[in-house]
Amino acid sequence: MTRLEARLAELASAGQTITYGALARDLGWRMADLTAALEMLMERDAAEGHPLRAAVCAGRLGAGLPARGFFDKAAALGFDLSDPEGFVARTRAALSGR
């Protein structure tokens, strides 16, 4: 498990979210590196039939929802985003085991 995966798992199990900036600082990464790693993780999660762990990230704007790029990538991976807030809520619940 990578440091990114471990941090996302810790947040998910606690039912918490984190901003992209805070996560990048926690890991000591540049934002571009974090974004690329999250997109690769989303691809792997989708391929393995797992909830998207990147859903625990929250943009600075948007009421605690992930940034636009999360939704663009999820749509490209074939997820139904007709109810974005519901999709994120269901995904976060699945990740936290609740």
Question: Where do the PLM segments sit?
Answer:
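Nucleic acid-binding interface residues in structured DNA/RNA-binding domains
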Residues: 3, 9-12, 17-98
